[in-house]
């Protein structure tokens, strides 16, 4: 790899984490993309100050030859544009070659949505298991209920602390992308599941002072992978097919809009920086309406 670019990439990543407050996963993604460029530039660039648009385009073309999806190309080029903009602002580049680096637009697929009937079957199944009193089953029911009730991300539910919960107002304080905090409400089924979990949470504890809300069998904060596996297993037999926690997020948003929720309220609930990101769910709702019309109307 190009040693100078690697060094700058690490400095850039540190800035993203400390000054911009990006999450570890986001920083890791940016760093990976810049290191990809560093590998390409090795032997092609003597001094970093000579980096130009031609080299960036050549790198992006090489990435495309790996049969990368448009969404991957879009993400990688966005990472490099951020990197070169930072280098320019730091005086490391006289001009910003990444400013004119264009990438194919990521094709947007309509997100999967789990049918309400399928969800109700899962909720009933989880409630039956939780009624055994087994702490893991009680916890798992709460996880699924809260993910659907709030539409929060898997990283956000795993990051919750006990003090994140306000039972008096039925809300949770969530730390989202960019360390932005938002308040998200939840309904009575999730509240019931939460209270049942809080009653057995102490059985997971191995030491005092643990602040994490969701705990594993060792008394530590439950990891993202464990939640992903739980949700994936529960959704595996539904018509939706292979899916994970993000599908529950999509489903919650779509069901809210189906029920007449305001688009901006849903944007705030999900923690989207852009309204355009939330608008994808309006397309899902229209598609569902069209499909329902086609199946139900005698002259469809």
Predicted feature residues:
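Conserved catalytic core of the tyrosine transesterase superfamily
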Residues: 1-300
């Amino acid at each position: 790899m190009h040693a100078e670019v690697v060094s700058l990439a690490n400095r850039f990543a540190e800035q993203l984490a400390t000054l911009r407050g990006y999450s570890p996963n986001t920083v890791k993604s940016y760093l990976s993309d810049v290191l990809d460029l560093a590998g390409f530039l090795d032997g092609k660039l003597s001094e970093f100050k000579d980096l130009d648009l031609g080299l960036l385009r050549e790198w992006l073309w090489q990435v495309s030859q790996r049969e990368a999806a448009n969404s991957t190309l879009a993400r990688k080029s966005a990472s490099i544009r951020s990197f070169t903009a930072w280098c320019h602002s730091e005086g490391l580049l006289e001009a910003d070659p990444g400013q004119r680096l264009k990438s194919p637009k990521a094709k947007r697929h309509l997100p999967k949505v789990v049918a309400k009937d399928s969800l109700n079957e899962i909720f009933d199944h989880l409630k039956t298991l939780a009624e055994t009193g087994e702490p893991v089953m009680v916890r798992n029911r709460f996880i699924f209920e809260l993910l659907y009730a709030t539409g929060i991300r898997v990283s956000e539910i795993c990051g919750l602390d006990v003090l994140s919960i306000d039972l008096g107002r039925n809300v949770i304080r969530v730390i989202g992308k960019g360390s932005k905090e938002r308040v998200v409400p939840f309904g009575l089924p999730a509240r019931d599941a939460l209270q049942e979990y809080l009653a057995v949470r102490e059985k997971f504890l191995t030491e005092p002072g643990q602040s994490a809300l969701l705990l594993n069998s060792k008394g530590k904060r439950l990891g993202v992978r464990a939640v992903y596996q739980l949700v994936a297993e529960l959704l595996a037999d539904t018509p939706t097919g292979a899916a994970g926690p993000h599908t529950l997020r999509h489903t919650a948003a779509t069901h809210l809009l189906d029920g007449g929720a305001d688009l901006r309220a849903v944007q705030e609930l999900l923690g989207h920086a852009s309204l355009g990101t939330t608008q994808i769910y309006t397309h899902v709702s229209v598609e569902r309406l069209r499909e329902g019309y086609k199946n139900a109307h005698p002259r469809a």
